[in-house]
Amino acid sequence: MYLLIVKKTDRLEGIVKAPPSKSYTHRAVIGASLADGVSRIINPLWGADCLSSVHGCRMLGANIELDKEKDEWIVKGGELKTPDNIIDIGNSGTTLRILTSIASQIPKGYAILTGDDSIRKRPMQPLLDALKQLNIEAFSSKLDGTAPIIVKSGKIYGNVVKIRGDISSQFITSLMMLLPFNKEDTEIILTSPLKSKPYIDITLDILNKFGIKIDKTDNGFLVYGNQKYKPIDYIVEGDYSSASYLIAAGVLINSNITIENLFANSKQGDKAIINIVKEMGADIKVKKDKVIIEGEYSLKGIDVDVKDIPDLVPTIAVLGCFAEGKTEIYNGEHVRLKECDRLRACAVELKKMGADIEEKPDGLIIRGVKKLKGAKLNTYHDHRLVMAFTIAGLKAEGETIIEGEEAVKISFPNFVDVMKSLGANIEVK
């Protein structure tokens, strides 16, 4: 396991590019694998999770060429096949959930999907129950609603599927990507309020690019039947979740940084980081395709509803530590179901640095202390915690040692190099 050694940094300066969007890359490569013909995914995220989707799609029959030099993936899709081995999707929950549904459309036999320790704890039962309503046989090998998942080849029957909206939006994305294969139109009815709605907006956006028509209804969505995915050339935009660490660093530290490849009209929910730091008092400049930050700024605590932005929780928690007054994060029960229990992890680890932070069932209360001290932190193999805690370490007195640096390969493989290029005092050991 690698350690990240982070020391207090007085100045950040430079122009950097936000890494490509993880959410868009996943959906683009899976959609392209379902399209009959050749698609090009341009500027994809070369992160471990998205490469898990590449691996899973290859196992299900797609021919995918990865061209590092041109920074594009060429995908020849359209013909699903029965995999000749178990599909190991590593640490990618998105891959597991979307491909569980897609695997039902193989021509014969079974597909088995599994992953690492963290993945084998993630809830899958709501999706398995939904698939059962559509005559699809998919079950947990342990019969406890978690991976390994065994999926039987089968035709979709039925025109209504009911599913909860408050556990994971990935279940709904999975159904949306499957149901164009149904011969008839299908209504997805949400039986509880939808959380992480912006991720569904991303799914709708990319499915529309592939020629798939889905309408919103009063209580869910209507997916039209007998549709075909069309091959496309698709350029992946920058990722606001990953950029949130760069934005937080610029806001907290004396800085002059420009983050390119961030589009003001993006459908990503995590674009909310812009309004969050502005509301806290950071006068950052937002252009059509970039963000300019001239920090540092005096921040004040605010209340943040994280129902739709679970991935921003670690970033907001760190910002709250350095803000005047109280920052409250609420509506985040689902944040406990990520790579780790992120609410607990933020509370436990930031306390080691001297933070005044209190855990609640659905969030965190942080009282700004303005100063943190270096400490040795555990990140529970969670990429977002590695990056958020790095930003805390850049502002803290002394040296912060962060375990599990390699986790950043999931969403922001060159995070350390990008931070160093801005002048961050960090090294990997």
Swiss-Prot record:
Locations listed in the record: Cytoplasm
One GO CC term on file: cytoplasm
GO biological process, any: chorismate biosynthetic process
GO terms, molecular function: 3-phosphoshikimate 1-carboxyvinyltransferase activity
Swiss-Prot/TrEMBL keywords: Amino-acid biosynthesis, Aromatic amino acid biosynthesis, Cytoplasm, Transferase
Cysteines engaged in disulfide bonds, as pairs: none
Pathway: Metabolic intermediate biosynthesis; chorismate biosynthesis
Active site: D311
Coiled-coil residues: none
Annotated binding of phosphoenolpyruvate, by residue: K22, G93, R122, Q170, R342, R384
Residue sites binding 3-phosphoshikimate per the record: K22, S23, R27, S168, S169, Q170, S196, D311, K338
Catalytic activity: 3-phosphoshikimate + phosphoenolpyruvate = 5-O-(1-carboxyvinyl)-3-phosphoshikimate + phosphate
CDD domains noted in UniProt: EPSP_synthase (cd01556)
Entry's EC annotation: 2.5.1.19
Subunit structure: Monomer.
Record-stated family: Belongs to the EPSP synthase family.
Function: Catalyzes the transfer of the enolpyruvyl moiety of phosphoenolpyruvate (PEP) to the 5-hydroxyl of shikimate-3-phosphate (S3P) to produce enolpyruvyl shikimate-3-phosphate and inorganic phosphate.
Entry protein name: 3-phosphoshikimate 1-carboxyvinyltransferase
Gene name of this polypeptide: aroA
